[in-house]
Amino acid sequence: MKKLLILLLLPLAGCAASGPERYVDPLVGTEVWQGGIAIAGHEEASGYTFPAVTEPFGMTAWTPHTQASKEPGTLHHRVPYWYSHEYITGFIGTHYPSGAVMFDYGAVELMPVSGTLRVRPEERSSSFRHQTERPTPARYEVTLADYGIDVRRAASKSAAAFEFTYPECDSAFVVVDAMPSLFTAGAPASITVSPERREISGKSAQTARAYRETGYFVVRFDRDFADYGTFNQNMDYPEVIENRYLFTEQEGKMVNGLRGVYTHRSPWQGDIRSERIDPVIDFDWDWYRPADDIDVKDYQVTWSGQLLAPESGEYLLGLQADDGARLWLDGELLIDDWGPHGYSMTPVQRAVTLEAGRMYDLRVEYYQQEWSSRVKLSWVRHEEGARRLLLRGNDRLESSTKCGAYVRFETEAGEPLRAWVGTSFISEEQARANLEREIGRNGVDRVAGATSELWNELLSTIELPGADEVQKSVFYTALYHAFLLPRSLSEDGRYRSPFDGEIHPGESFTDYSLWDTFRALHPLLTLLRPELSSRLVTGLLNAYDEGGWMPKWPNPGYTNCMMGTHGDAVIADAYVKGVRGFDTQKAAEAMLKNANVKGNHIAWGRLGIEDYNRLGYVPVDHYRESVARTMEFAYDDWCLARYFEALGDTLRSREYDERSLRYRNVLDPETRLVRARRSDGEWSSPSDYDISVWSGFNEQGVLNYRKNYTLFAPHDIPGVVDFLGGDRAAEAFLDDLFDNGIYYVGDEFSMHAPYIYNFCGMPWKTQRRVYDIVNTYYLPSPSGLPGNDDCGQLSAWYLFSAMGFYPMCPGSPEYQLGVPCLPEVVLHLPNGRDFRIVCENFGPGRCYVRQVTLNGRRLTRPVIRHEDLLAGGELRFTVGDTPATDCYEARL
C-alpha cells in the first residue's frame, strides 16, 4: 500500500528523467565493445546488459526483446536486447541476470500489432529506429515502425504499466506470449483469457540448468475485448528423432540407432577414441564424461547412419548444441552451427522434403569446448504448425510448451490502449495482488514517477560536484547497473524458494553472480547499503537451509557455474566491516561445509575438495580447471580465517590461515607461473588447456590465462611478488600484462592486477594503469563496457576505481588507493555522515599522486580502512602529470 500511496501523491511526470537518474544511459553495454580482446579471442567483449526498467533490485525487469531479422531461427541471442538488432518481437518481463551469460526464467511478453494478426515472434516483429527510443531506469518509449504504434512503458518491482497508441483501426491486437524466452521452451505453460475481467493470465516455467521456477502473470486491459483467442506453437517445437527412425549397420545387419565415434580434439591428448551405438541423439552430459575413455573437455562426436521418414512431406530438422554441431543429409550440409556457444532451447532448423519409406544417409558432428555439454537432434512436420496455430475464441490452453493468447480492440487514432501486468513466482493470485499493491490502475507517468523516486534516492547516495556531463553519464550508468541485482524474490513477506520449491516466510534473493560480484559489487553494497548487505547474506543462508548448500551462482537455483564458493567471501567481508543482523553460527556452519564436505553434485560446494584437503591442491587428472580451483579454494579458506578471527575462534582462524597458503602448491618455480599438477605430484604440461575453459584451447590463450591466474592470491600479494622474483621482476611481469594486451579488465580473476604495483613500491604505476582503464575502456555508448557486466561487477570495479580506492581483497577492511578520475566525490553514508574525496589540480592526464591526506593528515601508505570511510571526513589527493616516487613514505 505504501507504493500505491506514493503513486497517488505524485504529479503526472513528463518523459524526461530528473535527478541523477537523468544521467543514466540504459543502452550502455548492449553492443560489442570495439577494443578487441587479447586474452581469449573467442570471448565476446559485450556488456550483455539490456535497458532494464524496474525498481532497484526488482523482481521483474522489462525490456524490448529484439532479433536480428524476420527470418525464422534468428531469435537466438542469449541476452533479450541487442543494440545492433533491427526488430522488436515484443516487450518482455524478464528475469535474465543483467550482464551475465546465464539463463532467463519465468518470462512473459506483450507485443502490439495491427492489421493482420501475427503471433510467431519472427512474424509479429517490427522494425524500429534507435532515434525513437527513450530509455531510463523507470520507463521506456519507442515507435514500432512497421505498425505505426507508439509504445510507452513503466515498471515497479514486479508489475508494469503499458500504453499502446495505434493508428485508427478495427484490428488493433495485443499478443501475450507465455513462453517468450529461449530458455523456457519445452517447459509446461498455460494461458487463460477472461473477457469478463478484461484479463489474460497464465504461467510459464523454465527447464534450463537451474531448478525449475514457474513464473505467473496477470495482464489487465482498460477496455472490453472485440475478439480473442489462443495460439499453440507446440507443433513448431521439435521432438527428438526417435530410435525407430534411426538405423546403422552392426555386424552385417541393420540395427536401430546411430554409430557414435568419440574422440579428443586437442593434439596433446592424442587420438583416444570410443565407439558405440547410441539409440538417439539427446544428451546432457553437463560436466561429466560422455564415454569412459573420453575426458570431460574438448572432445568431438561423429554420429553416422540412416534416417527413415515415417510420412512424406516437409520436415524441419533441428540441432541444439553446446558447443558446435552440424548435420549432413545424403551428403549435403544442411545445418552448420560450428562455433563455441551456449545451449539454446530454440534449435537451429532447416526445412527438407522427405519421402515415406526412403532411407537417407545421416551424419551429425558435435564438439564440446567449454562449460557444459549438451546436444539434441530433432524434427517436426512443418505444415502441421500452420494448421493448428490459431485457436480463435478459445479461452484456455494448458500444458503447452509454446503458447500464448491474443486480444483484439477497436481504437481511435491517438487514443492510448492501457494495459497492466503483474508477475509472481508464487501464484497467479499473488501476481494479481502484486499488481494491485504496486501500481493499481495508475498510468505510465505515475508509475514511472514513483520508480524514478526510488532510483534517484539510491543514485543520490553518491554526489559528483564539478563532474562534466560525460563523467556523470558513465558514473551513474555504472551505479544503475550495480543496483539491478541480486534480484529480490520476496512478495508480501514471503517467497517461493528456487532451492526446494516451497513457499517460505521472510526474504530471498537470487542471481548473485558470486564468482564475479564478491570482488567489488558486494563490497560496494556493504559500504553504501549495509542493511541490504545483511539481507543478502540472510538470503544465502536461507538457500543453505532450503537446499543444503550455499549456492555458487544461483540462477534462480543451484548451478555449476564457476569454481570457488565465494559466498564465503561475501559473508566474511560483510562481517569484518561491521555488518550484523544475520545468523553468524549458521553462516559458520555453511562455510565449514563448503570447505570440508564433498557435494554429490557439481553444483554444490567445492568440486575437488576431497583431493584439495588430501593433497593440498586439486589434481588435473581428476578435475577440470584444477589450478583455478586450487587458487580460489585457498582464497576462500583465507576468508574463513578472517571470519573466525572476527568471531574470536582462534584455532579455526589459524587452521584456515594455513590452508590459505595451499595456492603455492600450484606455483611452478621453473616457469614462474601457475601450473597444473597430477595426483601423483608431477607437473602437467605447461600447455595443458586445463587452466580455463575460456582459454581458447590454444597455446597463447593458455599462456595468457596462466599469467593472469598467477596473480589470484589477493590475500597474499607479497607472497606472489616474492614468487615472481621480487619488486623489479613483478613490475616487469605486470608491465608485460598491460603493455602487450594480456590483461583484460573484462574478466574478473585479475581485476585487481593494476593495484599490485602498490605492493612493488611503485604506486605511481597503479595510478597510471587505473587512470587509463577508467578513461579508455568505459564510455557512454552502447559499446561502452569492455566485457560482460556480470550482474554489476564490471561497473562496480569502475565505480571504486573512479573514486580513487578499491577493495582489492574482500575479507579485509583495507582498500588500496589509486587516483580519483573525478574532480570530487561525496559519499552520503547510511550512518548520516559524509565522506568527501577531492582531487586537487584535477585535469586531463594528471593521473600521478603527489600526496594524499585524510582529514588533513598525510597518509604514508596507499591504503585507507573501512572505518575511516564510515567516520566521515575528507580524503584529498593532490595530483600532477609526472610520476611522484615519494608520494608515500612507506611501502606495503
What are these model-predicted stretches?
Residues 1-4, 717:
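Positively charged n-region of N-terminal signal peptides that target proteins for export
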Residues 4-13:
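Sec-dependent N-terminal signal peptides
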Residues 328-331, 830, 854-857:
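Short strand-turn-strand beta-turns centered on an Asx-Gly dipeptide
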Residues 241-316, 320-395:
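Extracellular/secretory pathway-exposed regions associated with glycan biology
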Residues 17-245, 250-253, 396-569, 575-631, ...:
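Accessory carbohydrate-recognition regions in carbohydrate-active enzymes
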Residues 140, 172-174, 313-315, 323-325, ...:
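Short beta-strand/loop motifs in extracellular/secreted proteins, especially
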Residues 636:
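ATP-dependent phospho-/nucleotidyl transfer catalytic cores
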Residues 144-146, 249, 265-267, 379-382, ...:
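Short acidic, glycine-rich loop/turn motifs
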